[in-house]
Amino acid sequence: MRLFAFLWSSVAFLSTVQAQVSQTASQTQDDSSTPTPTPTDKYVNIADALRTKTPMATPNRTIMPTRQDPRATEPPTPEPTYLPTPSPTPAPTPDPGPWVAKWMDHDQVQPFKQPDPVTVSEKAAVKFKPQIHITNGCHPYPAVTWWGETSGGLKTKGAPSAGCKGSGWGSQVYGRSTWVKGVWAIMYSWYFPKDSPSTGLGHRHDWEHVIVWIDNPDIENPKILAVTPSAHSGYSKQVPPSADCVDGTSVKVKYESKWPINHALESTTEGGETQDLIMWNQLSENALRAMNSVTWGDANCPFCDGNFQAKLDKAWPF
Protein backbone atom coordinates (compact mmCIF):
# COMPACT_ATOMS: atom_id res chain seq x y z
CA MET A 1 0.00 0.00 0.00
CA ARG A 2 2.86 2.31 0.87
CA LEU A 3 4.59 1.48 -2.38
CA PHE A 4 1.49 2.32 -4.33
CA ALA A 5 1.13 5.67 -2.61
CA PHE A 6 4.84 6.52 -3.33
CA LEU A 7 4.45 5.72 -7.01
CA TRP A 8 1.29 7.82 -7.29
CA SER A 9 2.95 10.80 -5.68
CA SER A 10 5.92 10.53 -8.07
CA VAL A 11 3.66 10.50 -11.13
CA ALA A 12 1.79 13.56 -9.89
CA PHE A 13 5.08 15.43 -9.27
CA LEU A 14 6.39 14.69 -12.75
CA SER A 15 3.12 15.89 -14.33
CA THR A 16 3.32 19.16 -12.48
CA VAL A 17 6.95 19.77 -13.53
CA GLN A 18 6.15 19.06 -17.19
CA ALA A 19 3.28 21.56 -17.16
CA GLN A 20 5.55 24.29 -15.74
CA VAL A 21 8.22 23.67 -18.37
CA SER A 22 5.67 23.92 -21.20
CA GLN A 23 4.32 27.19 -19.87
CA THR A 24 7.81 28.67 -19.58
CA ALA A 25 8.71 27.74 -23.16
CA SER A 26 5.53 29.41 -24.45
CA GLN A 27 6.36 32.65 -22.67
CA THR A 28 9.87 32.60 -24.08
CA GLN A 29 8.62 32.46 -27.65
CA ASP A 30 6.18 35.35 -27.06
CA ASP A 31 8.86 37.63 -25.63
CA SER A 32 11.62 36.86 -28.17
CA SER A 33 11.22 40.29 -29.82
CA THR A 34 12.31 42.13 -26.69
CA PRO A 35 15.80 41.76 -25.11
CA THR A 36 15.97 39.67 -22.11
CA PRO A 37 17.42 41.69 -19.26
CA THR A 38 20.51 40.24 -17.71
CA PRO A 39 19.63 39.01 -14.33
CA THR A 40 21.43 40.48 -11.45
CA ASP A 41 23.64 37.97 -9.85
CA LYS A 42 22.84 37.38 -6.34
CA TYR A 43 26.27 35.90 -5.61
CA VAL A 44 29.89 37.23 -6.24
CA ASN A 45 32.10 35.30 -8.63
CA ILE A 46 35.30 34.91 -6.60
CA ALA A 47 37.52 34.18 -9.62
CA ASP A 48 36.39 37.38 -11.41
CA ALA A 49 36.88 39.39 -8.26
CA LEU A 50 40.43 38.15 -7.91
CA ARG A 51 41.25 39.06 -11.54
CA THR A 52 39.93 42.59 -11.25
CA LYS A 53 41.07 43.28 -7.73
CA THR A 54 42.31 46.82 -7.32
CA PRO A 55 45.72 46.84 -5.62
CA MET A 56 45.68 48.35 -2.25
CA ALA A 57 47.63 51.58 -1.89
CA THR A 58 50.73 51.12 0.15
CA PRO A 59 50.81 53.76 2.84
CA ASN A 60 53.98 55.84 3.18
CA ARG A 61 55.82 54.38 6.09
CA THR A 62 58.51 56.33 7.88
CA ILE A 63 61.31 53.98 8.76
CA MET A 64 62.31 54.69 12.26
CA PRO A 65 66.06 54.79 12.91
CA THR A 66 67.46 51.67 14.35
CA ARG A 67 67.84 51.99 18.03
CA GLN A 68 71.49 52.36 18.93
CA ASP A 69 72.95 49.43 20.69
CA PRO A 70 73.59 50.69 24.21
CA ARG A 71 76.70 48.55 24.35
CA ALA A 72 78.30 50.75 21.68
CA THR A 73 78.60 53.59 24.18
CA GLU A 74 80.55 51.43 26.55
CA PRO A 75 84.37 51.64 26.35
CA PRO A 76 85.85 48.84 24.30
CA THR A 77 87.33 46.00 26.20
CA PRO A 78 91.11 46.57 26.17
CA GLU A 79 93.28 44.01 24.49
CA PRO A 80 95.07 41.83 26.97
CA THR A 81 98.67 42.86 27.64
CA TYR A 82 101.09 40.03 27.18
CA LEU A 83 104.56 39.99 28.61
CA PRO A 84 107.20 40.22 25.89
CA THR A 85 108.69 36.97 24.86
CA PRO A 86 112.17 36.92 26.36
CA SER A 87 114.98 36.82 23.86
CA PRO A 88 116.80 33.55 23.81
CA THR A 89 120.01 33.58 25.74
CA PRO A 90 122.78 33.90 23.19
CA ALA A 91 125.09 31.00 23.00
CA PRO A 92 128.42 31.71 24.64
CA THR A 93 131.19 32.65 22.27
CA PRO A 94 133.22 29.52 21.80
CA ASP A 95 136.79 29.67 23.01
CA PRO A 96 138.87 30.12 19.86
CA GLY A 97 141.63 28.15 21.51
CA PRO A 98 145.31 29.01 21.57
CA TRP A 99 146.61 31.29 18.85
CA VAL A 100 148.55 29.56 16.11
CA ALA A 101 151.28 31.79 14.74
CA LYS A 102 151.04 32.54 11.02
CA TRP A 103 154.46 33.64 9.84
CA MET A 104 155.11 35.33 6.53
CA ASP A 105 158.04 36.96 4.74
CA HIS A 106 159.02 40.20 6.44
CA ASP A 107 158.71 42.22 3.23
CA GLN A 108 155.13 41.00 2.57
CA VAL A 109 153.56 42.26 5.80
CA GLN A 110 151.22 45.14 5.01
CA PRO A 111 150.88 47.93 7.60
CA PHE A 112 147.69 49.41 9.00
CA LYS A 113 146.69 52.78 7.62
CA GLN A 114 146.85 55.53 10.21
CA PRO A 115 143.21 56.20 11.23
CA ASP A 116 141.91 59.67 11.88
CA PRO A 117 142.25 60.29 15.62
CA VAL A 118 138.96 60.49 17.49
CA THR A 119 139.59 60.16 21.22
CA VAL A 120 141.71 62.40 23.41
CA SER A 121 144.40 59.74 23.72
CA GLU A 122 144.51 59.15 19.96
CA LYS A 123 144.83 62.86 19.23
CA ALA A 124 147.65 63.19 21.75
CA ALA A 125 149.44 60.16 20.30
CA VAL A 126 149.36 61.66 16.80
CA LYS A 127 150.43 65.06 18.10
CA PHE A 128 153.55 63.67 19.83
CA LYS A 129 154.43 60.99 17.26
CA PRO A 130 158.25 60.72 17.24
CA GLN A 131 160.69 60.54 14.34
CA ILE A 132 163.41 57.93 14.05
CA HIS A 133 166.81 58.25 12.39
CA ILE A 134 168.48 55.00 11.25
CA THR A 135 172.21 55.33 11.87
CA ASN A 136 172.90 51.71 10.86
CA GLY A 137 171.04 48.43 10.68
CA CYS A 138 167.51 47.64 9.51
CA HIS A 139 164.76 50.14 8.88
CA PRO A 140 161.49 49.56 10.74
CA TYR A 141 158.93 47.22 9.14
CA PRO A 142 155.32 46.28 9.90
CA ALA A 143 155.12 43.36 12.34
CA VAL A 144 151.53 42.14 11.93
CA THR A 145 148.76 42.26 9.34
CA TRP A 146 145.06 42.86 9.86
CA TRP A 147 144.53 39.06 9.65
CA GLY A 148 147.11 38.38 12.37
CA GLU A 149 149.93 37.21 10.13
CA THR A 150 153.30 38.11 11.61
CA SER A 151 156.71 38.85 10.18
CA GLY A 152 159.11 35.95 9.98
CA GLY A 153 162.10 38.28 10.36
CA LEU A 154 165.59 37.73 8.92
CA LYS A 155 168.62 35.65 9.69
CA THR A 156 171.70 37.43 11.05
CA LYS A 157 173.80 37.23 7.94
CA GLY A 158 175.19 39.87 5.63
CA ALA A 159 175.47 43.55 6.40
CA PRO A 160 173.46 45.03 9.29
CA SER A 161 170.92 46.41 6.77
CA ALA A 162 171.02 43.51 4.29
CA GLY A 163 167.49 42.66 3.16
CA CYS A 164 165.87 45.30 5.38
CA LYS A 165 166.40 48.74 3.89
CA GLY A 166 162.69 49.52 3.96
CA SER A 167 159.36 47.90 3.11
CA GLY A 168 157.71 48.56 -0.21
CA TRP A 169 154.36 48.49 1.61
CA GLY A 170 155.38 51.26 4.00
CA SER A 171 156.38 51.07 7.62
CA GLN A 172 154.57 51.25 10.94
CA VAL A 173 154.91 52.61 14.46
CA TYR A 174 152.75 51.08 17.20
CA GLY A 175 151.36 53.12 20.10
CA ARG A 176 149.77 52.54 23.48
CA SER A 177 149.14 55.00 26.31
CA THR A 178 147.89 55.26 29.87
CA TRP A 179 148.22 57.15 33.15
CA VAL A 180 151.19 56.33 35.37
CA LYS A 181 151.27 58.01 38.77
CA GLY A 182 149.48 61.10 37.47
CA VAL A 183 151.58 61.43 34.30
CA TRP A 184 150.37 60.46 30.82
CA ALA A 185 152.74 57.97 29.18
CA ILE A 186 152.70 57.29 25.42
CA MET A 187 154.77 54.32 24.25
CA TYR A 188 155.85 54.24 20.58
CA SER A 189 157.31 50.95 19.31
CA TRP A 190 159.10 49.87 16.12
CA TYR A 191 159.75 46.37 14.77
CA PHE A 192 162.96 45.41 12.91
CA PRO A 193 163.39 42.09 11.04
CA LYS A 194 166.79 41.50 12.66
CA ASP A 195 169.22 43.05 15.12
CA SER A 196 172.66 42.30 13.73
CA PRO A 197 175.73 44.50 14.25
CA SER A 198 177.49 42.34 11.66
CA THR A 199 177.00 38.97 10.00
CA GLY A 200 176.54 36.18 12.51
CA LEU A 201 176.04 38.53 15.46
CA GLY A 202 172.75 39.52 17.06
CA HIS A 203 169.39 37.79 16.61
CA ARG A 204 166.30 37.50 14.42
CA HIS A 205 163.62 40.12 15.23
CA ASP A 206 164.06 43.30 17.22
CA TRP A 207 161.68 45.60 19.09
CA GLU A 208 162.65 49.08 20.29
CA HIS A 209 160.50 51.81 21.79
CA VAL A 210 160.48 55.28 23.26
CA ILE A 211 158.12 56.56 25.96
CA VAL A 212 157.02 60.19 25.84
CA TRP A 213 155.77 61.47 29.20
CA ILE A 214 153.38 64.45 29.12
CA ASP A 215 151.43 66.30 31.79
CA ASN A 216 147.89 65.90 30.45
CA PRO A 217 146.58 64.89 27.01
CA ASP A 218 143.25 66.64 27.59
CA ILE A 219 144.50 70.23 27.75
CA GLU A 220 145.09 72.62 24.89
CA ASN A 221 148.89 72.58 25.02
CA PRO A 222 150.25 69.48 26.75
CA LYS A 223 153.87 69.66 27.80
CA ILE A 224 156.56 67.00 27.34
CA LEU A 225 157.98 66.23 30.78
CA ALA A 226 160.42 63.44 29.92
CA VAL A 227 161.60 61.04 27.22
CA THR A 228 162.86 57.48 27.85
CA PRO A 229 164.28 55.59 24.81
CA SER A 230 164.78 51.82 25.18
CA ALA A 231 168.31 50.39 25.27
CA HIS A 232 169.20 46.71 25.88
CA SER A 233 166.25 45.92 28.17
CA GLY A 234 166.74 49.23 29.99
CA TYR A 235 166.24 52.95 29.34
CA SER A 236 168.11 56.18 28.97
CA LYS A 237 166.25 59.15 30.45
CA GLN A 238 165.94 62.83 29.61
CA VAL A 239 164.00 64.90 32.14
CA PRO A 240 163.06 67.19 30.48
CA PRO A 241 164.34 66.45 26.96
CA SER A 242 166.87 68.76 25.36
CA ALA A 243 165.26 71.31 23.08
CA ASP A 244 167.60 70.15 20.27
CA CYS A 245 166.12 66.65 20.55
CA VAL A 246 162.54 67.81 19.98
CA ASP A 247 161.06 69.08 16.73
CA GLY A 248 157.94 70.97 17.78
CA THR A 249 156.03 68.21 19.58
CA SER A 250 157.95 65.34 17.94
CA VAL A 251 160.87 63.88 19.87
CA LYS A 252 163.86 62.64 17.84
CA VAL A 253 165.55 59.29 18.42
CA LYS A 254 168.14 57.27 16.50
CA TYR A 255 168.53 53.51 15.98
CA GLU A 256 172.19 52.61 16.26
CA SER A 257 174.57 49.75 17.01
CA LYS A 258 177.98 50.37 18.53
CA TRP A 259 179.78 47.28 17.39
CA PRO A 260 179.72 44.58 18.60
CA ILE A 261 176.80 45.59 20.82
CA ASN A 262 173.28 45.18 19.49
CA HIS A 263 171.10 48.08 18.38
CA ALA A 264 169.36 50.48 20.75
CA LEU A 265 167.57 53.83 20.71
CA GLU A 266 169.03 57.14 21.86
CA SER A 267 167.79 60.71 21.83
CA THR A 268 169.36 62.66 18.98
CA THR A 269 169.48 66.05 17.38
CA GLU A 270 169.25 64.47 13.92
CA GLY A 271 165.90 64.50 12.21
CA GLY A 272 164.36 61.26 11.08
CA GLU A 273 161.31 59.68 9.48
CA THR A 274 157.80 59.09 10.76
CA GLN A 275 155.54 56.14 10.04
CA ASP A 276 151.80 55.49 10.06
CA LEU A 277 150.72 55.22 13.69
CA ILE A 278 148.33 52.50 14.81
CA MET A 279 147.24 52.48 18.44
CA TRP A 280 146.70 49.31 20.45
CA ASN A 281 142.92 49.73 20.58
CA GLN A 282 142.82 50.31 16.80
CA LEU A 283 144.34 46.94 15.91
CA SER A 284 142.08 44.18 14.60
CA GLU A 285 141.10 41.33 16.91
CA ASN A 286 143.38 38.90 15.11
CA ALA A 287 146.28 41.34 15.26
CA LEU A 288 145.76 41.77 19.01
CA ARG A 289 145.68 38.03 19.56
CA ALA A 290 148.84 37.63 17.53
CA MET A 291 150.70 40.37 19.39
CA ASN A 292 149.70 38.87 22.74
CA SER A 293 150.64 35.33 21.73
CA VAL A 294 153.57 35.32 19.35
CA THR A 295 157.08 34.98 20.74
CA TRP A 296 159.80 36.90 18.96
CA GLY A 297 162.83 34.92 19.99
CA ASP A 298 165.29 37.12 21.87
CA ALA A 299 163.12 40.20 21.27
CA ASN A 300 160.05 41.19 23.28
CA CYS A 301 157.01 43.12 22.10
CA PRO A 302 156.91 45.94 24.68
CA PHE A 303 153.28 47.04 24.32
CA CYS A 304 151.49 43.68 24.52
CA ASP A 305 149.39 42.96 27.60
CA GLY A 306 152.08 40.88 29.27
CA ASN A 307 154.80 43.54 29.05
CA PHE A 308 153.23 46.99 28.83
CA GLN A 309 152.80 47.90 32.48
CA ALA A 310 156.12 46.38 33.54
CA LYS A 311 157.94 48.41 30.89
CA LEU A 312 156.28 51.62 32.05
CA ASP A 313 157.20 50.95 35.66
CA LYS A 314 160.80 50.26 34.72
CA ALA A 315 161.03 53.38 32.53
CA TRP A 316 159.55 55.73 35.19
CA PRO A 317 161.83 58.79 34.89
CA PHE A 318 160.88 60.93 37.91
Curated annotation (Swiss-Prot):
Residues 23-41 have a biased composition (Low complexity). Residues 23-42, 51-96 are annotated as: Disordered. Residues 73-96 have a biased composition (Pro residues). Glycans are attached at N60. Key residues/motif important for the effector activities are degenerated in most NLPs, including the nlp24 peptide consisting of the conserved region I (11-aa immunogenic part) and conserved region II (the heptapeptide GHRHDWE motif) that is important for phytotoxic activity. Belongs to the Necrosis inducing protein (NPP1) family. This is NLP effector protein 7. It comes from Phytophthora capsici.
